[in-house]
Amino acid sequence: MKRPARSIILCGIKHCGKSTQGKRLAAALGLDFYDTDDLILEQCGMDARAIYKSQGKDAFMAAELKACEYLRDTLQAKGSQGQEAAAAKCAVIATGGGICQNEPAIAILKKLGTIVYLEVPEITAAGRIVREARFLPDGTIQNLPAYIANKNPADQKEVRAIFHDFYMERTKKYRSLADITVQAQGSRSENTKKILSELGLD
């Protein structure tokens, strides 16, 4: 199998399969795998959702940018060592669902590699969010993404309505910044093959 000349950066909304596909691609191509959400947890001692909820959007975006700066510096350092420098500079990177709003972070990632947008149907993504949520007897809903929870939905119907507006806005944004858009509607193995094919690595 061919090796990429640049890193592969996976983006898309929550639950589109970025981390799953990232690990599969890294294994198939023999590359290191990084997840910006994991880096945020390692660097800040709390996960991305907790930072957003307790410290706000600006603090979260700063943490996300710091993770991308770490990736840039790490991959550049690897690329300066030994005969396999070019290969070492390449990795597979899964990003957080809101990376499209973080322009400084996107600017770094675009210099590192190819931005691949994993697009899933709205009904699929909404269904995953609803399944993950906890609808309590007192009417409260737990474990929702912040952008939904902040609008205080009363029931599943309102959750889906809020998500619809979000999905349309994010889809437009991701399509505009991505180098490649992949319709990730198949099985895990099918989606991996699609990504490799779109990248010319099959």
Where are these regions (language model features)?
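ATP-dependent small-molecule kinase phosphotransfer cores
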Residues: 38-110, 141-142, 147-152
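Walker A/P-loop
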Residues: 19
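P-loop (Walker A) phosphate-binding loop of NTP-binding proteins
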Residues: 13
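A glycine- and Lys/Arg-enriched "phosphate-lid" helix/loop adjacent to the NTP-binding pocket
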Residues: 114-171
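ATP-binding Walker
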Residues: 16
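NTP-dependent small-molecule kinase module
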Residues: 2-8, 24, 28, 90, ...
